C-alpha cells in the first residue's frame, strides 16, 4: 500500500537560486516500541553570483526533509567575494577533522574539486578553481570546511582599508 506523499509548499520555487542536494541519509531513533526512521538531508543554495548558503533538514519523508534543508540554506546565505569566476587568493578552511585547500585558477581550468566541494562552487558561481580536501571525507564536515575557507576570502579593497593604503599602493 502506497503511503500518502505530502504536498510540499513552494515546491520548485523560481527565485533564481541554484539548489544542490549533497546528501540524503536515513537515520534511526531507537525507542522502547522499536525504531523510528527519518531522513536527514544536506543541501546548498546559491545565486550563482557570490551568495551561498548551507542547510540541513530532517523529516520522516525525503521530500519534506529536502524542503526543510533548502529553506534552512536560503535563510543562511553569505556573500563571498569572487574575482573573474574564481577566488581572489589561496585559502584554507577546517571543520572537525576535515581540511580544505582552495586556490584560484586561470580561466578555462574548470572546477577541480571533489564531491561536496564541487556542489558548493557550482551554486556559488565559481567557474575556475582548484580545491583539495584533506582528512575527513564526511560531506557535512567538508562543506563546513569549504564555507570556513570561503569566509576567509578578502578583496584588495578590504586589505587596503585595513592597512590605511590605496589599492595602487598595495600592488606597487
From Swiss-Prot:
Gene3D superfamilies per the UniProt record, alphabetical: 3.30.160.20, 3.30.230.10
UniProt keyword annotations, A-Z: Ribonucleoprotein, Ribosomal protein, RNA-binding, rRNA-binding
GO cellular component annotations of the record: small ribosomal subunit
Signal sequence bounds: none
Ranges where the S5 DRBM domain occurs: 17-80
GO biological process, one term: translation
Organism domain of life: Bacteria
Pfam family membership, one: Ribosomal_S5_C
UniProt key word Ribonucleoprotein: yes
This protein's record includes keyword RNA-binding: yes
Entry's Gene Ontology molecular function annotations: rRNA binding; structural constituent of ribosome
Cited function: With S4 and S12 plays an important role in translational accuracy. Located at the back of the 30S subunit body where it stabilizes the conformation of the head with respect to the body.
Domain notes: The N-terminal domain interacts with the head of the 30S subunit; the C-terminal domain interacts with the body and contacts protein S4. The interaction surface between S4 and S5 is involved in control of translational fidelity.
Family per record: Belongs to the universal ribosomal protein uS5 family.
Assembly and binders: Part of the 30S ribosomal subunit. Contacts proteins S4 and S8.
Protein name, as recorded: Small ribosomal subunit protein uS5
Species: Leptothrix cholodnii (strain ATCC 51168 / LMG 8142 / SP-6) (Leptothrix discophora (strain SP-6))
Amino acid at each position: 500500500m502506497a503511503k500518502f506523499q505530502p504536498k510540499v509548499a513552494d515546491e520548485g520555487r523560481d527565485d533564481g537560486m541554484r539548489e544542490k542536494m549533497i546528501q540524503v541519509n536515513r537515520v534511526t531513533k531507537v525507542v522502547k516500541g522499536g525504531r523510528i526512521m527519518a531522513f536527514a538531508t544536506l543541501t546548498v543554495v546559491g545565486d550563482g553570483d557570490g551568495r551561498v548558503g548551507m542547510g540541513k533538514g530532517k523529516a520522516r519523508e525525503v521530500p519534506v526533509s529536502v524542503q526543510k534543508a533548502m529553506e534552512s540554506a536560503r535563510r543562511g546565505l553569505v556573500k563571498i567575494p569572487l574575482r573573474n569566476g574564481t577566488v581572489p587568493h589561496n585559502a584554507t578552511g577546517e571543520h572537525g577533522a576535515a581540511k580544505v585547500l582552495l586556490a584560484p585558477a586561470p580561466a578555462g581550468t574548470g572546477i577541480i574539486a571533489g564531491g561536496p566541494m564541487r556542489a558548493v562552487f557550482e551554486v556559488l558561481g565559481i567557474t575556475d578553481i582548484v580545491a583539495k580536501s584533506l582528512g575527513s571525507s564526511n560531506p557535512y564536515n567538508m562543506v563546513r570546511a569549504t564555507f570556513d575557507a570561503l569566509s576567509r576570502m578578502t578583496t584588495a579593497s578590504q586589505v587596503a582599508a585595513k592597512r590605511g593604503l590605496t589599492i595602487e599602493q598595495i600592488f606597487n
